[in-house]
């Protein structure tokens, strides 16, 4: 009891104010007080004799537990000084008590883990002997003793044979994986219906003079067994692009010429070939896939040459007539055209994008094509509408909205110098390639090296905007407030895509500012799928689609929209 009294006396003498004022008004003083209390507790423990004094409870707890609780409290106080719920719309994780998984969920997770282990163990087992001698004869296997001691006593001389079998097995596995991963082995499944004029055949002489970035700049130099192959365009057989092909080093981690050749031939057969030539094109694709699966470089090059001969033999008027009747195309065709321009203009200069300052408004990140197709579809983006991207980076979102949905205008604004330069070069490359593929690219406009704040062109277009994209994942408070002012003039029906909610947590209507657009937003939250953004492959994040309404949204009046519900039973949380 003496230790307890000494402890209380030290705290009281350190600061004459009540303890509740210490906690609220002076966290630094609180830290000093706790340190003083710890020191006093240590002195009292040293003064005691025997084991009885050292185990004396302090304030109903052991001294170690009290110090631990004080450190946790200090951590919370320091954390609270960094966050302001009103301005940053978030709380630190240490303020949120996480629910424990229920017993049912825990049991299911354990069962799933056991099943996974069993599956892995079963995958390592050989085929059972009940398959019969015929199966063993076909596979070239001989019966082996099942005794583990016999396996352990196998002579070391068989190591070479085993290694040889392992190498052969790994070679077969690699070929199987390549065959399964063939970009041109199976027909495209995700098909979209064209709601606008997608194809436009331009003057032949104009396309002959088109300048595209060569793929040779993306492939390594002086590689053994490397062959240069020409691939002719289906609409303009006089125009071709060169590729370096080698199965020894098919992929340098950035660009795979073999994949791109196969995809170009696949799309030409699926989309551009008239019905009378479809059968020949399908056989050619099978030949190409077989050469790819067997890693036969000469057979692959021969198949490409046969494709070039077939392209020259197809009458161009039949191709043009077939395109006029085409109403569906694979969505992957659009994504791959975008990738062709991106890989030649952005990837070689991607290091310039790393100059962005971390944890600032100028951190660079990309939304990937598959996610953009999904979110544009959720926003019901249509031909003839206006799409705007504020903070457009290298322009990926802008060009995809134009190419995939045929917007009347796709507009992007970017302030950073390097990203602006890449956006300009990527747009030029895309225009050249779309012309060679006969694709009608709708109007695209950029406001480069300029902020979207106090931007005359942005202010002019926003009232007409139908779909607005703002990647506000790392915007600070000041920029979020500027965005709130900027979007006040959006028309009813406009969709706003964001990675952070425009309306802060616990937002309720301010009757002194009833006309604020935040009162008229209908906010929908969605889970971010895997491979949606460039900065992480994991999913599980959130994105929001807010629809501007003509009237005030009812949710801003509801009690659950408040940050703290009063007069209601508090929610129960597990410890």
Curated annotation (Swiss-Prot):
Functional note: Histone methyltransferase that specifically trimethylates histone H3 to form H3K79me3. This methylation is required for telomere silencing and for the pachytene checkpoint during the meiotic cell cycle by allowing the recruitment of RAD9 to double strand breaks. Nucleosomes are preferred as substrate compared to free histone.
Enzyme Commission code(s) on record: 2.1.1.360
GO biological process, alphabetically ordered: DNA damage checkpoint signaling; DNA repair; global genome nucleotide-excision repair; meiotic recombination checkpoint signaling; methylation; mitotic G1 DNA damage checkpoint signaling; mitotic intra-S DNA damage checkpoint signaling; negative regulation of heterochromatin formation
Gene from which the chain derives: DOT1
UniProt GO cellular component terms: chromosome, telomeric region; nucleosome; nucleus
Organism: Eremothecium gossypii (strain ATCC 10895 / CBS 109.51 / FGSC 9923 / NRRL Y-1056)
Reactions catalysed: L-lysyl(79)-[histone H3] + 3 S-adenosyl-L-methionine = N(6),N(6),N(6)-trimethyl-L-lysyl(79)-[histone H3] + 3 S-adenosyl-L-homocysteine + 3 H(+)
Location in the cell: Nucleus
Keywords noted in UniProt: Chromatin regulator, Methyltransferase, Nucleus, Repeat, S-adenosyl-L-methionine, Transcription, Transcription regulation, Transferase
Name of protein: Histone-lysine N-methyltransferase, H3 lysine-79 specific
């Amino acid at each position: 009891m003496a230790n307890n009294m000494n402890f209380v006396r030290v705290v009281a003498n350190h600061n004459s104010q009540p303890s509740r004022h210490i906690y609220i008004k002076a966290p630094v003083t609180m830290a000093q007080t706790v340190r003083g209390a710890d020191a006093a507790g240590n002195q009292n423990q040293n003064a005691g004799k025997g084991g009885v004094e050292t185990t004396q409870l302090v304030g109903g707890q052991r001294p170690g537990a009290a110090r631990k609780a004080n450190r946790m409290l200090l951590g919370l106080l320091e954390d609270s000084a960094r966050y302001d719920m009103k301005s940053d719309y978030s709380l630190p994780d240490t303020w949120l008590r996480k629910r424990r998984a229920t017993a049912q969920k825990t049991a299911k997770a354990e069962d799933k883990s056991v099943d996974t282990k069993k599956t892995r163990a079963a995958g390592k087992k050989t085929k059972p002997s009940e398959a019969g001698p015929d199966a063993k004869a076909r596979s070239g296997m001989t019966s082996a003793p099942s005794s583990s001691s016999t396996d352990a006593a196998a002579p070391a001389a068989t190591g070479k044979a085993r290694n040889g079998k392992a190498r052969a097995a790994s070679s077969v596995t690699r070929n199987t994986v390549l065959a399964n991963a063939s970009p041109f082995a199976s027909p495209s499944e995700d098909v979209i219906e064209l709601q606008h004029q997608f194809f436009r055949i331009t003057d032949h002489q104009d396309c002959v003079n088109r300048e595209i970035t060569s793929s040779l700049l993306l492939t390594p130099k002086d590689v053994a067994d490397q062959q240069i192959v020409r691939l002719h365009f289906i609409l303009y057989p006089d125009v071709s692009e060169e590729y370096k092909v080698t199965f020894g080093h098919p992929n340098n981690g950035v660009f795979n010429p073999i994949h791109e050749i196969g995809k170009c031939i696949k799309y030409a057969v699926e989309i551009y070939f008239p019905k009378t030539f479809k059968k020949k094109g399908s056989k050619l694709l099978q030949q190409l896939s077989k050469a790819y699966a067997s890693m036969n470089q000469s057979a692959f090059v021969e198949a490409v040459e046969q494709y070039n001969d077939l392209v020259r033999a197809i009458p161009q008027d039949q191709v043009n007539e077939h395109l006029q009747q085409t109403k569906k195309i694979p969505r992957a065709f659009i994504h791959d055209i975008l990738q062709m321009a991106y890989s030649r203009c952005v990837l070689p200069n991607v290091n310039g994008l790393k100059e962005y300052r971390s944890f600032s408004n100028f951190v660079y990140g990309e939304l990937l094509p598959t996610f953009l197709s999904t979110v544009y579809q959720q926003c019901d983006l249509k031909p003839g509408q206006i799409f705007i991207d504020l903070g457009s980076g290298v322009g990926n979102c802008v060009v995809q909205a134009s190419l995939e949905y045929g917007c009347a205008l796709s507009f992007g604004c970017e302030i950073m110098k390097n990203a602006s330069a890449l956006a300009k070069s990527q747009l030029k490359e895309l225009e050249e390639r779309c012309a060679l593929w006969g694709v009608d690219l709708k109007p695209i406009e950029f406001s480069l090296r300029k902020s979207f704040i106090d931007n005359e062109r942005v202010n002019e277009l926003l009232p007409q905007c139908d779909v607005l994209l703002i990647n506000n994942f790392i915007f600070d408070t000041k920029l979020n407030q500027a965005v709130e002012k900027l979007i006040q003039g959006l028309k009813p029906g406009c969709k706003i895509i964001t990675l952070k909610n425009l309306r802060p947590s616990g937002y309720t209507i301010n009757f002194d500012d009833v006309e604020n657009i935040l009162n008229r937003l209908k906010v929908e939250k969605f889970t971010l799928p895997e491979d949606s953004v460039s900065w992480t492959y994991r999913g599980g994040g959130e994105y929001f689609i807010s629809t501007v309404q003509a009237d005030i949204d009812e949710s801003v009046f509801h009690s659950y929209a408040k940050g703290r519900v009063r007069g209601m039973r508090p929610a129960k949380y597990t410890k």
